Amino acid sequence: IITSPNHYAIYASALLVGGHVFNKPDWIKMSTKVLHRFCVQEQAADGYWGEHSQAGPTTGYDYLTLTQIAVYWEYSKDPEAHKALRRSTDFHKYFTYPDGTPVETINDRNRHWGVSMWGHFGFSHFPDGRRYAAFLTSHFPYDGDLNSYGGNMQSFGRIAQNVLYYHEGKTAPIPQDMVNYAHAMKIPAGIRKTGSWVVTYSGIIAPPVSQNNFFLDR
């Protein structure tokens, strides 16, 4: 299938849920194989799922892929999914600006993205993830979501999904709560916060994808 990882993960998670709803073991088996692979092979060491390669992230769309792994865990309780969610939480909590928007400097598809409501329940397995979910929600544009993927209707649907699957528990501080923090990725990129200033640096070299209208040079 020639498509992006977030699409492929959405197809697989829809097949998984459909398999449980309609009692189709073959659907469950096929989707489980795909989503388990997303957990153990397709995720980069820094916690993201690259859209074109593992050489760098696609910050906004990564929320979509994360959501499908979170759904997969809810139905399978695969421990590898839990590990993948931990890595994803670490990635997103570091690479989110103080206003809740994902860092665009390292993004190879979108220069700007709104505050995402996708997959907060995936973060909610962990104390810092629950705090991160609350942080994102606090920046949701209550007068109308015109910037994130899908706009109002998509975000409202994702909020409902978060309510359905959310894991309550204690919270722990995240980088946005700190006066200063710095984080370096395994690839040549990182972020630093000093007071009210946040600076992201990137030396990512990702080869251009031929005839791909969605690719942005980093």
Question: Positions of the model-derived regions?
Answer:
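Aromatic-lined, polymer-binding surfaces characteristic
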Residues: 1-83, 108-117
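Extended polysaccharide-engagement surfaces of secreted carbohydrate-active enzymes
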Residues: 78-218
